[in-house]
Amino acid sequence: MLNTMRDYLAYSGLQYQKPEKAGQDAEKMLYLRSKGQEARKAFTELAKAFQARHPEWILQRSSQWMNQAQRLRPHFWAYLQREGRVTEPMLALRLYGSSSDFGVSLEVSFIERKKDERTLDQQAKVLEVPVVEGIYYLVYSDGESHKMEATEENRQILREKLFHQEVRKVLVKVDVPVTDGQILDKFLDELDKTFDKLLPYYQATRN
């Protein structure tokens, strides 16, 4: 399962075209499609295995392997909803990295296309929780995103920037790298540790 996702990342970003319209590249397109479908299935199985350890959470559908521009996505994601509506912040699993260095991150975030007038204010509450070791912030402003180290100083800076609308949203994330030869259960154990770290940040969005 983990190796299937690793193999797929070597092809992420490549342009896909329906095989029947690809001419001499038809075989290549069939191959890319199979890689995308296999990797999405593997990611979905991973997400289901994680959700089975947290049955109070409802797993949403995994993202498709191809984006609207018909390129192989550089990552997959799946949201987990415990209560409330899909407009509100949830937890999300997200594949990241390259075939030589990859893993799955867990984050407190929301589905952008589902948000309503309250969503951004709810998400901002993650900054009301003191930092813990291992987390980082993903900061969005002016249509771009960048990582920021999670320190108490940066937490206060981001609260100010959100207040003055210099930043649009801040996600709280933890990356869980996949190590060579790692078995699924051990990886899920690491995701569980991450879940425990992030739960207070999710709970803050519920208040």
Task: Give the role of each language-model region.
Residues 1-51, 148-207:
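Long, solvent-exposed, polar/charged low-complexity segments
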Residues 9-15, 83, 132-138:
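A broadly tuned "polar low-complexity/structure-edge" signature
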Residues 41, 68-77, 141-153:
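Short charge-dense sequence patches
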Residues 44-74:
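Short N-terminal edge-element motif at the start of the domain
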Residues 58-60, 83-97, 135-141, 167-172:
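Short, surface-exposed, charge-dense and proline/glycine-enriched linear segments
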Residues 68-129:
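Aromatic- and glycine-enriched beta-alpha-beta binding-site module
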Residues 78-80, 104-106, 137-139, 170-174, ...:
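Generic structural hydrophobic/aromatic packing signal, biased to beta-strands
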Residues 109-168:
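Short, internal acidic amphipathic alpha-helical interface segments
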